[in-house]
Amino acid sequence: MLTRSASYPDRETAQWATQQVVTANEQAIHRWLAQNTRARLTVEAAWPSREEPVGRVQLEGDLLAGRGPVDVRAARVVLRREPSSPLGFVVHTTVPFYL
């Protein structure tokens, strides 16, 4: 069941946010790769003092109440193991995230 919808304003912002999340979670990513257990890893980061939002999120409850989407300054990235990738993983998905 879909409870929210989210989007980045443009490709540049999506790439920036994704790279920032990966960089901020570098140690967790290295541990995940070393443990060789789960196929995917979800990591997040937030930039509350960032002037520009990284995206917009529409929550189902807000939509039903007649409210529009909200600007957000956080992102969630899902990584997937990929042995053929130089880093050992690829980005499965990335979305702006409402904290």
Annotate the PLM regions:
Residues 1-99:
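Functional cores of ribonucleases/endoribonucleases
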